[in-house]
UniProtKB/Swiss-Prot annotation:
Organism: Pestalotiopsis microspora
UniProt record similarity statement: Belongs to the LovG family.
Protein name stated in the entry: Esterase GME11355
Keyword terms of this UniProt record: Hydrolase
UniProt EC number: 3.1.2.-
Xref: InterPro entries: AB_hydrolase_fold, FSH-like_dom, LovG
Length: 268
């Protein structure tokens, strides 16, 4: 079955590109399907590229009811007991390699547009925030950037706090969890909590379902991990899902296009 990325016409090859990171217990192919309405609305403006997480996983809740034939299922973070052999450095390497493979694969298809943004759902959204923190900390300290694109903004769909420390050798904070964990194992240091070093500085759009069991963690992600004045919030009547109804998607698309123009990614 061809990827949606293979069906773009030649004009789309030069469009700005958004890298999309799927949730835990799914995979890139499933996330393409989950984002089909979002993709259709963004197609005139962006090329969406879907990365595949590095670690195999059991299917996420409800995944097999629709996508049972889409195995193997993947996850970005090796937090299960059987994954204890993976060091934090190895996890970061595996994540970076998976992202690099998605970028190189799309380049080989002839795509030439700039990489401009990250979009993630659930565990993928946690990773989007983690990547943006790594980028912003290095930039704010005038340090050499990590090799790869500069991300102008992020789209956070049901992203649970806390983000992950992807650059512990350069910057670490008790507000961030280790790559081999899903949560912080001890209370954060008060000085770290009051600092803005762990907060994302580029614009982010947060879409949060009001019936999602993780809503309090989604709100924490926005309130505790973003610089004030850089965020946009969409609350909608849904659980832990990607928006499919046009009325819900339209709101998200409006925010994405507005932020893209504000950051200079798109020009009228």
């Amino acid at each position: 079955m061809p990827s949606r990325n293979d069906t773009y016409d030649d004009k789309a090859l030069s469009l700005p590109r958004i890298l999309c990171l799927h949730g835990g217990g799914t995979n890139a192919r499933i996330f393409e399907s989950q984002c089909r309405v979002i993709s259709a609305h963004l197609k005139p403006y962006f090329r969406l590229v879907f990365a595949e997480a590095p670690y195999e996983s059991a299917p996420g809740p409800g995944v097999t009811s629709v996508y049972a034939d889409y195995a193997p299922f993947k996850r970005w973070l090796p937090w299960l007991p059987e994954d204890e052999h993976a060091s934090n450095e190895e996890v970061v390497h595996d994540i970076d390699q998976a992202i690099e493979e998605a970028i190189m694969s799309d380049d080989k298809k002839g795509a030439s547009g700039p990489w401009v943004a990250l979009l993630g759902f659930s565990q993928g959204a946690k990773l989007v925030m983690s990547l943006l923190i790594r980028q912003d900390v290095r930039r704010s300290r005038h340090a050499p950037p990590i090799a790869g694109p500069h991300w102008a903004f992020g789209v956070i769909l049901a992203g649970r706090a806390p983000p992950v420390a992807l650059d512990a050798g350069f910057f670490n904070s008790t507000m961030l969890c280790e790559p081999s964990q899903l949560d912080i194992v001890r209370p954060p240091d008060m000085i770290d909590a009051m600092s803005e070093d762990h907060r994302v500085r580029v614009p982010t759009i947060h879409m949060q379902g009001l019936f999602d069991q993780g809503l309090h963690l989604h709100r924490e992600m926005l309130e505790d991990y973003c610089i004030e004045g850089t965020t946009r919030l969409i609350e909608w009547n849904a659980a832990h899902v990607v928006a499919l109804k046009r009325s819900d998607v339209d709101v998200l698309i409006t925010h994405i296009l507005e932020v893209a123009r504000e950051t200079g990614v798109l020009r009228d």
